[in-house]
């Protein structure tokens, strides 16, 4: 919400005005305040039908009636043990089969072995079974976002203050666009100071394969997505000053990503290497939708074809090098550059 405020009133932030103006003039920005309104309502609390205050500040999932008994079954004490709900960051189709099944227990993590959150990572009964994910995925596919950020808060501290991006899977399987993805992830992390002031956020390629949003968004929607775990295990804090400070420390990284998408780097900023254009029919000059634009050095079988939109436009981020491009569509001769 602070990002919306900054763009609505850039004159109130003179230090960022030039960057804000450049981003607005050069790109289209969509901000989704929450992907999980049901889970957020549980965290914020509500008054039930018996006039009781109900709240679970550690709740993670949505409110899907997983055990189908018509009641919202959750445990407000501690982490996990909530019988209902689906983890929306495990409900995407890519590698969904490796996610947690219903009532699967948790083993914690090496950095916090005492943290156990049983049932919290349930993948759902099927990929895209949850309305929230169906809606978000449609948005991603409809609008061809080139970059995106998904902000999370780390209850466990296991992955606190970290920028995570696609991917470095077992067997040294790197994302085809890794030479674009990794440097930007590192730059975002290095622009984000930690809460206690001793250094900046960590950065790492995702090694997990279990229906995550950032892997699906990149592979299927063509949007390189960075998962940013803000704050430490003290989230969700009641301290308003801490919340505002956490937001403020994360803004430079967000602006840096937007400038990368927009192709601007003033007064300082990211690489500008990218390619974009419009594919048209040589016989009539009309734009052609659905042309596959393949970059030989950045292609792979796990990626969905990168297609021109209804205006014939394509847009890809690059790194400093030479590239081989192929344009293809049924009914036309292939073109190579």
Located regions from the model:
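Active-site-adjacent structural elements in enzyme catalytic domains
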Residues: 1-74, 83, 136
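Metallocarboxypeptidase
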Residues: 27, 53, 59-60, 67, ...
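Structural motif
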Residues: 270-272, 277-290
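Solvent-exposed strand-loop boundary residues in beta-sheet-rich modules
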Residues: 283, 297-299, 331-333
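Short, acidic Ser/Thr/Gly-rich low-complexity loop/linker segments typical of extracellular
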Residues: 286-319
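A short, solvent-exposed loop/turn motif at the edges and junctions
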Residues: 322-337
């Amino acid at each position: 919400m602070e990002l919306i405020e900054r763009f609505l009133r850039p004159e109130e932030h003179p230090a960022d005005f030039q960057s804000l103006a450049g981003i607005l003039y050069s790109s289209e920005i969509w901000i989704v305040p929450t992907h999980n309104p049901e889970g957020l309502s549980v965290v914020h609390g509500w008054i039930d039908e018996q006039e009781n205050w109900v709240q679970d500040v550690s709740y993670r999932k949505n409110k899907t009636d997983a055990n189908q008994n018509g009641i919202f079954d959750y445990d407000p004490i501690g982490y996990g043990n909530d019988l209902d709900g689906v983890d929306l960051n495990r409900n995407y189709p890519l590698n969904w089969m490796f996610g947690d099944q219903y009532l699967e227990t948790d083993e914690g993590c090496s950095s916090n072995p005492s943290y156990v959150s049983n049932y919290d990572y349930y993948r759902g009964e099927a990929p895209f079974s949850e309305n929230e994910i169906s809606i978000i995925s449609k948005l991603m596919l409809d609008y061809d976002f080139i970059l995106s950020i998904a902000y999370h808060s780390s209850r466990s501290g296991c992955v606190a203050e970290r920028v995570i991006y696609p991917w470095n899977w077992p067997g040294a399987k790197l994302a085809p666009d890794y030479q674009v993805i990794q440097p930007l992830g590192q730059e975002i992390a290095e622009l984000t100071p930690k809460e206690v002031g001793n250094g900046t956020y960590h950065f790492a390629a995702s090694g997990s394969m279990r229906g995550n949003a950032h892997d699906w968004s990149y592979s299927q929607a063509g949007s390189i997505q960075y998962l940013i775990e803000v704050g430490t295990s003290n989230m969700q804090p009641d301290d308003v000053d801490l919340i505002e400070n956490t937001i403020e420390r994360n803004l430079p990284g967000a602006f840096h990503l937007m400038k990368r998408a927009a192709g601007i780097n003033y007064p300082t900023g990211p690489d500008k290497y990218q390619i974009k254009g419009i594919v048209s029919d040589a016989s009539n000059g009309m734009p052609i939708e659905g042309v596959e634009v393949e970059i030989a050095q950045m292609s792979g079988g796990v990626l969905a074809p990168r297609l021109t939109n209804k205006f014939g436009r394509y847009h890809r981020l690059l790194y400093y090098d030479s590239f081989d491009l192929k344009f293809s569509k049924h009914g036309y001769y292939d073109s190579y550059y």
